[in-house]
Amino acid sequence: MALFSPPISSSSLQNPNFIPKFSFSLLSSNRFSLLSVTRASSDSGSTSPTAAVSVEAPEPVEVIVKEPPQSTPAVKKEETATAKNVAVEGEEMKTTESVVKFQDARWINGTWDLKQFEKDGKTDWDSVIVAEAKRRKWLEENPETTSNDEPVLFDTSIIPWWAWIKRYHLPEAELLNGRAAMIGFFMAYFVDSLTGVGLVDQMGNFFCKTLLFVAVAGVLFIRKNEDVDKLKNLFDETTLYDKQWQAAWKNDDDESLGSKKK
């Protein structure tokens, strides 16, 4: 129920600066009552209160504020980067550690097991030479470091000298001897046709002996057609420094002549 202010006295009505004061009462936390102001009726001279207006307070609305995600500090980023680098390095170390090594059933403890190369109770040295050549060819293509844990104990000196000659020298010697015999025969025939000196008489002639040594030396140095290119490369290497020296002096002379002309 609303409370009204006390009646206005006659003394206060006579005062022109007097402002009437009205009191409000709070009925509840959710409703406010606005008291009406009495007004004079022009006909009856009585006052009647106006209807009270009630205003409901708005209900509170829940507002959810989402906090922005906290940015990770730069230190954590650096730590993650270093962790990734360490992981990559670890993977590289693992890959480098898994190096393919030479494997052969006959290669045991850094040497060839000669018992596995035996044929009819004797060691087949040709097979040993072929196996060692294949191993060294593999090492050229896939270099492998030695260690004290797995030392290489095999030495080619254990292979007899006659096995080397039989393997490499005899087949090559047969080719060279056949080539030398053919060249010597045609040279002797050419000399005999020109001078009429026979083969026996040519052996006592200095010119014929010289041609014989030239033929033998040529057969030894030029065993294959590829050897001609090798000899050309060797000749170019022997004259390379001389050519460079002459080119340096030539450039200096050209520069000096150019400066004089200017």
Curated annotation (Swiss-Prot):
GO-annotated biological processes: photosynthesis; positive regulation of chlorophyll biosynthetic process; positive regulation of phytol biosynthetic process; positive regulation of vitamin E biosynthetic process; regulation of DNA-templated transcription
Induction, as annotated: Induced by light.
Phenotype of gene-disrupted mutants: No visible phenotype under normal growth conditions, but the double mutant plants lli3:1 and lli3:2 are dwarf with yellowish green leaves.
Keyword line: Chlorophyll, Chloroplast, Chromophore, Membrane, Photosynthesis, Photosystem II, Plastid, Thylakoid, Transit peptide, Transmembrane, Transmembrane helix
Summary of the function given for this chain in its UniProt record: Light-harvesting-like protein required for biosynthesis of phytylated chlorophylls and alpha-tocopherol in green seedlings. Functions by anchoring geranylgeranyl reductase (GGR) in the thylakoid membrane, leading to the stabilization of GGR activity. Binds chlorophyll a in the thylakoid membrane. Plays a role in the regulation of chlorophyll biosynthesis under light stress and under standard growth conditions.
Known partners and oligomeric status: Interacts with GGR. Forms homodimer, and heterodimer with LIL3.2.
Protein name in UniProt: Light-harvesting complex-like protein 3 isotype 1, chloroplastic
Organism name: Arabidopsis thaliana
Encoding gene, per UniProt annotation: LIL3.1
